[in-house]
Design a protein with these regions (language model features):
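Short acidic-glycine-tyrosine-enriched beta hairpin
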Residues: 80-99, 204-225
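Glycine- and acidic-residue-biased ligand/ion/polar-headgroup-sensing regions
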Residues: 64-80, 179, 185-205, 211-212
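A short hydrophobic beta-strand segment most commonly corresponding to one strand
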Residues: 70, 92, 105-122, 216-217, ...
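Catalytic core of non-heme Fe(II) oxygenases with the double-stranded beta-helix
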Residues: 33-34, 57-63, 153-163, 169-172, ...
Length: 249
């Protein structure tokens, strides 16, 4: 068997967040939140979603997360323990880590990313014994670099790596793509790739135009990117479930 065997063809899922119905969900504590699921795992559990916290919402007591939890604040203000997080903040609670009490100081919207098997349990004075959250008050303050694919620097691109899972190599990144970029054609990745458009425009092909608020899931070993291009440039939040690579077809 070679690397090209057992590839899927054109099964990417692209949608706009406005088209996803809001569900009421209880994720942290007892107060419900608004949830627009982006992707669910095979067992029905949430992998990623857009969470809306109304002003005054609170998680109550600190919690322990069973698996890694990441979130990126899109708008609003969130009290996260002693930190106040606004738009463009990013945080990770490692598996088994102590997640401080949260409170929405304003209506707050975030992208939530969870690993498989996520659950939350109350903490009983064990904060100092558990991994602490990783907090980036401004994700854009992370030093950008020019990505290199197949030995070719992508000049005009900016990649900011926000977090890497030390066990799997899975990363979460901000990617700025310059205006007028056109991709090199069909490709696939060995891992799941999820993309949320934060600003601008992009399309993986002509049938899937994306704008701010659009979401794209490229399943692992799925051929996609047939006519990738952007007119005005864009900023994307990307996350994966393993070490990312790009394989040309």
């Amino acid at each position: 068997m070679n690397a090209q065997d057992n590839l899927a063809y054109d099964i990417s899922v692209c949608t706009h967040s406005d088209a996803i119905a809001v569900e009421e969900a209880t994720i942290w504590g007892s107060q419900p939140v608004g949830l627009r699921p982006l992707r669910r795992l095979a067992d029905g559990s949430l992998r990623s979603g857009i969470v809306t916290l109304p002003e005054g919402w609170s998680s109550g007591a600190p919690l322990s997360a069973a698996t890694h939890q990441q979130f990126a604040v899109l708008s609003g203000r969130l009290q996260f323990g002693e930190a106040t997080l606004g738009a463009n903040a990013f945080a990770v609670v490692p598996a088994g880590g102590a997640m401080p009490a949260m409170a929405a100081l304003e209506d707050t919207t975030m992208i939530l990313i969870q690993n498989e098997g996520q659950s939350y349990q109350p903490l009983n004075g064990e904060h100092h014994q558990r991994p602490a959250p990783v907090i980036l008050p401004d994700a854009y303050a992370v030093e950008p670099f020019t990505p290199v694919i197949d030995g070719v620097p992508l000049h005009g691109f900016e990649r900011r790596v926000l977090w890497i899972d030390p066990a799997t190599g899975a990363d979460t990144r901000l990617l700025r793509i310059p205006a007028g970029f056109s991709g090199a054609g069909a490709n696939w990745h060995p891992v799941q790739e999820e993309i949320f458009c934060l600003a601008g425009d992009i399309q993986p092909d002509a049938t899937r135009p994306m704008r701010a608020g659009s979401y794209l899931w490229n399943p692992a070993r799925s051929i996609h990117g047939f006519d990738e291009r952007t007119q005005g440039g864009c900023v994307l939040l990307e996350w994966h479930d393993g070490q990312w690579d790009l394989v040309r077809v």
